[in-house]
From Swiss-Prot:
One of its GO terms (cellular component) is cytosol. Belongs to the GcvH family. GO terms for biological process: glycine decarboxylation via glycine cleavage system. This is Glycine cleavage system H protein. Keywords: Lipoyl. Residues 21-103 form the Lipoyl-binding domain. SUPFAM superfamilies: Single hybrid motif. The modification N6-lipoyllysine is found at K62. It comes from the Bacteria. Pfam families: GCV_H. Binds 1 lipoyl cofactor covalently.
């Protein structure tokens, strides 16, 4: 796992793209709990999202799980590959399984996210 990723307590990950946008997906831990992903309800480009509010839905053979926005901003890109290949969320959660790119309203929000090493330690305690 990349050291530059940050996480939320609800198991979303965030990659700072360095241009005022972030890429968002769900963690390897989350996809493992869900099991085989069969559908991803993607947000729309230009949708406004707010920290902590649901903006996507991932359905698996076991359950449907809301995906919560880790930051406030505007959706600038969605991963359209997931429409035909939702299994990418399972196979490559940190690479081709990303869900959306968000233009940040306030980059300081990134400071409140959980660093990757702290996130991994919290999983070991579960």
């Amino acid at each position: 796992m990349e050291k530059d990723l940050k996480f939320t307590t609800s198991h979303e990950w965030v990659r700072d793209n360095g241009d005022g946008t972030v890429t968002v997906g769900i963690s390897d831990h989350a996809q493992g709990l869900l099991g085989d992903v069969v559908f991803v309800d993607l947000p729309e480009v230009d949708d406004e999202v707010t920290t902590g509010e649901g903006f996507s839905l991932v359905e698996s053979v076991k359950a449907a799980s809301d995906i919560y926005s880790p930051v406030t901003g505007v959706i600038v890109e969605i991963n359209e590959e997931l429409e035909d290949s939702p299994e990418l969320v399972n196979e490559e959660p940190y690479e081709s399984g990303w869900i959306a790119r968000i233009k940040l309203s306030d980059s300081s929000e990134l400071e409140s996210l959980i660093p990757s090493d702290t996130y991994l330690e919290s999983l070991d305690e579960e």
